[in-house]
Every structure is written in C-alpha cells, then in structure tokens.
A protein has these predicted regions:
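N-terminal module of bacterial RNA polymerase sigma factors
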Residues: 1-34, 41, 145
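Amphipathic, Lys/Arg- and hydrophobic-enriched alpha-helical face
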Residues: 28-46, 63, 124
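A short pre-motif secondary-structure segment
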Residues: 134-138
C-alpha cells in the first residue's frame, strides 16, 4: 500500500511491531478490508471469512520476523491468506455433513448484499482455477499485475494476459 503522510511505511510498522505488537494495529487497519474482501469471495459464508481473516492477521503478527520487505506487505499478507484458505478447505474435506447445518443455510430471506457476492462467486467458479485466482488477487486483494506475477511465479505480462482473457 502507498506511503501515508505523517505515518510510517508498512516496512517500518512491521519492524516496529516486532518489538511492540501494538504497532501492528495500524497495519491491521490498513489491510483488514483488502484481506477480508479477498477471503470473502473464496469461502462459503461471511462468518467463515471473518474467522479466517482473524486467523490470517494472528498468523501475520506471529510471523512478522519472516517479513523482510522484499515484497510489499500486502503481497505478503495475501500469501498468508492463500495458505490459510487452503488449510480451511483441507480441514473441511474431513468434516462430515451435518443435516442441521444444511437446514440453517436454506433459511428463507436473502440479504440483498449477498446476491452480488453470490453472483461473483458463481462467475469465478466458471473460470479455470488459475484464471479465477488471478482475478481474485487483482480485484479483491488489489494487487498489481507484477505482484501477482511474483506471487505465482509468472511474468507481469503473462498475468496481464491471463487477467485480460478472464475478464472477457
């Protein structure tokens, strides 16, 4: 994220947070919306997204010693989010179906805000996973093409091409 006037950079905040975890609060406020939006589109419910987002920030705080500033903080925390989302689905694979939980999800009354998200999720499921991931990282995590390329081990031009094809 860009430098804020009269505020420390992300790298400075990360370094300060290693000694004083309270300094992590500003990083949290800068990135909570970005991380939450990214997670929300990839998990079944807003409650799951809230829980996962909290775990992601807990993990980031405990792993700050690994952040060296080689990439932007936003790239680093979204990488953590990708891993936690994968863990979330691995854990769910072993869960059994609970009929009571299914009944709760089918309760009448659809929130208007959920319609847009459901539509986006449906459209993303129609894309091949690699294209959907690029769209999610670009649109919901607000990462640049070069940051996505760095994260996925591809060139910026390749990511631009994938994103362009996915948006057609």
């Amino acid at each position: 994220m860009e430098q804020y006037e009269d505020q420390p950079s992300d790298l400075e905040l990360a370094q300060m947070s290693r000694e004083n975890p309270a300094a992590f609060g500003l990083l949290y406020r800068r990135y909570i919306d970005t991380v939450y939006r990214y997670v929300l589109v990839r998990v079944p419910s807003p409650e799951d997204a809230e829980d996962l987002t909290a775990h992601i920030f807990e993990n980031a705080l405990s792993s700050l010693h690994r952040f060296r500033g080689d990439s932007r903080f936003s790239t680093w925390i979204i990488q953590i989010a990708r891993h936690r989302i994968a863990d979330f689905y691995r854990a769910r694979r072993h869960d059994t179906l609970d009929p009571a939980a299914l009944d709760e999800r089918e309760a009448p009354g659809i929130a208007p805000d959920d319609l847009g998200l459901d539509t986006v999720k449906e459209l993303l499921t129609r894309l091949p996973r690699a294209k959907a991931e690029v769209v999610e990282l670009r649109v919901f995590a607000d990462l640049s093409h070069s940051e996505i390329g760095e994260m996925l081990g591809k060139s910026e031009m390749a990511i631009r091409a994938v994103f362009s094809r996915a948006m057609k």
